[in-house]
Amino acid sequence: MLEAALLHLVKGIVDEPDQVRVSSRSTPRGEVLEVRVHPADLGRVIGRSGRTAKALRTVVAALADGRQVRVDVVDVDR
């Protein structure tokens, strides 16, 4: 559910919604949601001073219902 919600939010922000990928993996410290977008959309997802990324993390944390979830925006150029 978190993965689908994050995918929907990010697709609404970017210019290339077909290039958005969200993957989930479990770690001992909780779940990690990795967001991959087209390189031209990376700045749009991160936002000025990281505000958009912080807002996405806040929404996901609220939906997580107490579970430990981390959202990482991955730079696919590296």
Which residues make up each language-model segment?
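Glycine-centered tight-turn and secondary-structure capping sites
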Residues: 46-50
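RNA-contacting regions in translation and RNA-metabolism proteins
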Residues: 1-42, 54-78
